[in-house]
């Protein structure tokens, strides 16, 4: 699997280096000597693009069945005058310049693009601004679409359910979840800028360096960032959790700064290193920003599907779905209980009456993919409205899925 990152020099003008690394497990990474770009008289490096005029380089593997082979890898990047361009490659290493996609946006953040198989079109998310309630310019996320990667729709600002707060959304991190491609997940960076120095900044880690940065712009010392989580099924309306998914963490001289928690694009299933355990999810985010050493990329882990859960205390709780129709002959769940806890699944008709033969009984354990056993034939209920009632005690339910056993 490849990783692309940007490095830059502090020369005038600065050079932006787009670098390539690769891994077979998402944990250990190799930087091959590619011989493409000359740096300080040598091509023994992992730089694939060298430019004075590009930024925000994002690469994706184009899964459009009609994509020409020599365009399988596409990159989107920002060029001067607020233009979003693309580069093209057959192997993900040797890129050539393509064409301008749009000049209707800001584009100076991480612009994400992918082929949506369900919609049969390309989807791009980028940054812009809108006027806030107090006249402040608020960073936001916009969406554009294309069927051919050349002609793009007008930007449309995404909306949020159950989140009335007008947060600054710095990056977006929107992507189809590889375990459920019909669902988008996103890891945007939330930008928070307090407008004046207070006593808390004197107590907060890194105060002296924070004051030094403010010589260049006040926000370089006053702003802090963290990572949020949100999901969507249509790509336009998102459920955004207001609480941080990735906090700045324990105070240290290199934390609690503008630039913390910027999530890299992509999620990877990685082994835990413990025999017999389910894989876990790895994702990556920036740290060590605004220091005298290079920015670092940190790997974080969580359980498969473990972004959110329905959780109940030992006293118990229930989750009842809306009526749904399913295909398949098996139900699998991702769940975790304590030793004394449990989870039980009851299938009901549309009116909420329990169906005979469809009570799982007590389930306990901690598994990302547990098949639920019923005495009844689950396939007989396919394609007719049913409800699922999950009865939990000191337990978490992360996901459930109907499937055809053996497929």
Pin down the residues of each PLM region.
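Carbohydrate-active catalytic/glycan-binding domains of CAZyme proteins
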Residues: 1-407
């Amino acid at each position: 699997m490849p990783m692309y990152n940007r490095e830059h020099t502090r020369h005038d003008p600065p050079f932006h280096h787009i670098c390539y690394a690769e891994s077979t497990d998402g944990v250990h990474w190799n930087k091959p000597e590619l011989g493409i770009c000359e740096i300080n008289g040598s091509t023994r490096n992992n730089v694939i693009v060298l430019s004075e005029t590009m930024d925000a380089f994002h690469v994706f593997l184009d899964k459009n069945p009609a994509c020409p082979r020599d365009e399988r890898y596409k990159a989107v990047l920002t060029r001067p005058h607020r233009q979003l361009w693309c580069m093209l490659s057959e192997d993900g290493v040797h890129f050539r310049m393509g064409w301008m996609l749009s000049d209707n946006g800001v584009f100076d953040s991480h612009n994400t693009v992918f082929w949506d198989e369900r919609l049969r079109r390309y989807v791009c998310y980028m940054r812009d601004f809108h006027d806030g309630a107090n006249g402040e310019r608020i960073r936001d996320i916009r969406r554009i679409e294309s069927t051919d990667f050349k002609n793009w729709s007008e930007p449309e600002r995404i909306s949020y359910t159950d989140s009335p707060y007008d947060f600054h959304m710095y990056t977006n991190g929107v992507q189809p979840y590889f375990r459920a491609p019909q669902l988008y997940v996103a890891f945007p960076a939330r930008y928070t800028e307090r407008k004046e120095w207070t006593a808390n900044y004197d107590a907060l880690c890194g105060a002296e360096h924070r004051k030094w940065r403010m010589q260049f712009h006040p926000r370089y010392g006053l702003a802090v960032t963290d990572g949020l989580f949100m999901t969507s099924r249509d790509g336009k309306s998102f459920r955004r959790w207001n609480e941080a998914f990735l906090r700045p963490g324990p105070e240290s001289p290199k934390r609690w700064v503008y630039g913390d928690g910027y999530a890299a694009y992509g999620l990877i299933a990685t082994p835990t290193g413990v025999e017999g355990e389910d894989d876990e999810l790895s994702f990556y985010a920036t740290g060590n920003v605004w220091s005298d050493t290079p920015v670092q990329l940190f790997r974080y882990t969580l359980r498969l599907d473990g972004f959110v859960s329905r959780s109940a205390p030992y006293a118990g709780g229930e989750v009842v779905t809306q009526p749904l129709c399913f295909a398949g002959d098996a139900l699998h769940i991702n769940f975790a209980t304590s030793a004394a806890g449990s989870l039980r699944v009851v299938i009901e008709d549309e009116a909420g009456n329990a169906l005979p033969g469809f009570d799982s009984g007590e389930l306990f354990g901690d598994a990302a993919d547990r098949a639920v056993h019923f005495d009844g034939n689950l396939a007989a209920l396919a394609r007719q409205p049913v409800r699922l009632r999950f009865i939990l005690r000191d337990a978490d339910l992360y996901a459930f899925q109907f499937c055809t056993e053996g497929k």
